[in-house]
Amino acid sequence: MKLQFLQPNKEIENYLYWVLRSPQYREYCAGRAMGSAVVAMSREDFLSYEVPPFTSFRSNTVDLLEEIEKRERLLRETNATLEAIARTLFKSWFVDFDPVRAKQEGRAPEGMDEATAALFPDGFEESEQRLVPRGWRARSLDSFADYLNGLALQKFPAEGEDEYLPVIKIAQLRAGNTQNADRASTKLKAEYVVRDGDVLFSWSGSLEVELWCGGEGALNQHLFKVTSSEVPKWFYYLATRHHLPEFREIAAHKATTMGHIQRKHLTEAKIAVPSPEVLTRLTEFVAPLIELRIENAVRIRSLGELRDSLLPRLISGQLRLSEVEALVA
């Protein structure tokens, strides 16, 4: 259904936008939903919803909700840029070997100073039956990173109503949050607890590689938590992410209802790894991109939580404006 305003008014349009996103309106819709295959609501029921008066308090609250949404949008755009830059650098340095090829041809590598260019060799050698930059090694993903599979968490129920960890399954990984998640025990081994910034890889069903920023949770089966004591987070995250298309291709050809990969595929997936010294120097360029991306994603989550706490009060009016402004500041 599309709303058309007889007398365009941006303030009123924004107000109705947020009213229609409020939990009170969603509850109203749920109580009047029709159909089974396709749930819908009648035009009469929609038009019968009683919209609270547009007071100065609600006007100010809408302004704050608009500001929150604007901040979220800018942070998401920034994160998309940070991710794109990190992936581009990784592909150029560790897949296409652009700096090495440039030096081999007697050219200065593009986009880097002399000190950075000096980190890359000027030729190739064979490693694991493939050419890699001289002094580097072709290595399997699971040779430098640990892929910890999650638990069947139905065997670890929560201790109580207020003492639990939300269960992170594929659905939560894709959504980036733990809303409506199952609950598990808080007494799991530490390695099965997921925290902001952890790298998660769903290896079955819908294959995804993500930097988790949805708050503390419990690692469910069919998800790997990826860690390493040998290489930095940015490297094993981008290396795993680089191989995701081929992992999806493998899973798509599995003769089962739920395509997946096996650990042998982690062993078969190779990437060129430089010396620890070179990797440490390159970390100075890429790690800040990933760290800022994580920091921004946590901010987005916090803004979303704030928005969700404000929305019910837009209708009820049960919040002083000074409190709202303090929350958004």
Regions inferred by a protein language model and the residue ranges of each:
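A short glycine-rich beta-alpha junction/loop motif
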Residues: 1, 34-62, 217-224, 254-280
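Sequence-specific dsDNA recognition surfaces
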Residues: 122-128, 142-157, 164-196, 219
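Short, solvent-exposed loop/beta-turn-alpha elements that line the ligand-binding surface or hinge
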Residues: 105, 109
